[in-house]
Amino acid sequence: MTELHAEKGYAVTKLCELAGIARSAYYKWLKWMPSDRELENLALAKEVKLRYDKRNGILGYRQMRTQLNRKLKKRYNRKRYYRIMRALELKAVIRKKRPNYVKAPTLHIAENVMNRKFQAEVANQKWCTDVTELKYGNGRKAYLSAIIDGYDNSIVSWVLSHSNNNELVMNTVKKAYKRNPNATPLLHSDRGFQYTSLEYKQLQKRYKFTKSMSRVSRCLDNQPIERFWGTFKAESFYLEKYDTYDSLLRSVRTYIHYYNNFRYTERLNGLSPNEYRRAV
């Protein structure tokens, strides 16, 4: 504006009108002289820019303060450096946060070898296993693990526990082999964490069973044990209220004994699972 007025002779009033500023503001600007602090800030801003470029933009206002105060032998505070760097639009290179990786356990997954062919020609040829949740008392939880034989639908072994953990599943398998030490079944399960664990894989090597697993979200791939859960809950669990873990345990034990020995089905020629098992 000053150049246009001096060189072209344009009226200051017209130029101020075009610029949208008051004439008084223009004259005030002409008379403005920077204060000592403003001059100091300008000098400091120059030092900040030089140091920022020299360090390839890695300095934030804290490090900038430490380095320049030492160089200039000053005690400027952090806010001053912060304001100057913000005015100059200087930002430190942000260090990328290192991902907090938690190494996931190796999953030992098997194919769906069973492929829904559950019918077995002999006992201990095909087993299916799973864990179901049972509630008792005031919302407390227990977990029932069981193995069912595809030959006669008998419950080969079962374990009730307060915790749904590896130990529950391992004890169920060990109990089944204690009763059937020479069994070499195809043992089918879902892909729950217990069945994909290293401990389960080691148990497989120990007992030499063939591992089979359901496909993801395909509960019908494990139909025999799923059907048993439905039968057990409809005929026993849902009919009673269990105030304690011990009362639930007694009920489970009573029902499975009944199921194996006295629940007769047409599929087994009118026999119970254990009767059919002994008859052949």
Locate each region found by the language model.
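Active-site beta-loop-alpha junctions of metal-dependent nucleic acid enzymes
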Residues: 140, 159-180
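C-terminal domain-tail junction helix/linker
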Residues: 201, 205-209, 231-280
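An active-site-proximal beta-strand-loop segment
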Residues: 120-156, 162-163
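RNase H-like polynucleotidyl transferase catalytic core
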Residues: 94-99, 187-191, 207-224, 241-243
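Acidic/histidine-rich, metal-coordinating catalytic segments
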Residues: 182-196, 271-272
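Basic, flexible linker segments flanking DNA-binding modules
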Residues: 16, 25-122, 272-280
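Residue-centric detector for conserved, function-critical "anchor" positions
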Residues: 1-11, 43, 276
